[in-house]
Amino acid sequence: MANKLIVAPAPHVQTSQSTARIMRDVVIALMPALVVSTVVFGADVLRVTALSVAACVAFEYLIQKFLVRGAVTVTNWSAAVTGVLLAFNLPASIPWWIVVIGAFVAIAIAKMTFGGLGKNPFNPALVGRVFLLIAYPVQMTTFPMPVNGAFDALSGATPLAAVKHGAAADVLGVQELLLGNMPGSMGEVAALALLCGFVYLLWRRVITWQIPVTVLATMALFAFVVALCSGESGAALWQLPLFHVLAGGAILGAVFMATDYSTSPMTVRGRVIFAVGIGAITMCIRLWGAYPEGMSFAILIMNACVPLINKYVKPKRFGVK
């Protein structure tokens, strides 16, 4: 009875959705992209995804069982979601031991060190991805060509990397960007499948539209202004915005990672500020940074700003005009 009188710090969110149900919906929303990625890159996609999920679940179980010695919560599917998202940020050709290291960093360091689900300030899958990118840059930037392409098993540059090194923004058509028949990480090659997952999450009311739409709109507007200042006109003026929205990890990050409950602001206005920051930082890194992709860094930077956003962007108290 005494435990029922303990009140946790605000905010107090009331919802009929359980954590397990929310996480299962996220996994279901990721399935279309997993299928497309498997078609594009072959069975290695299933190998990497299964290993990543198994490693994340195993590390969380072992830490909760033998180190924390508390309740084991692997049945809430949160570790499985982290495993799938981590896998989606990796090349299909990545060695198995790098996947295990990434899972350890994501779960043990980025999640359980801070107390577990809901207490982590940074998205665990992205922390694992960025760590691997810094520690193993060659393996993380060596991408297999699509299995139905002309250069099976050879490494190729992603569309973002090609544009970074001087290629035109129309290096790939809209169809290729939507269907994913191109080199890249497992989860960034199927824009249409990811958009289907976005619609599903909206329908299930797992996420709201503010963060994904604002992130992508900010990126498109940023790219449009850059193209305009570069003297582009006509169809070329719209190619750069469309390319940056559909290429790389823009949709994956905006829909599935930036919307993480524990690492995003509580208010609608705060989410918009958060999303604008992600979109702007992503474009700055893509256009002028050292890496062709900046979504992971942008989300983690804005994750660090969430406490500040929540502090200064608060809803009005009841009765206050």
What positions do the PLM features span?
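N-terminal signal-anchor module of multipass membrane proteins
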Residues: 1-57
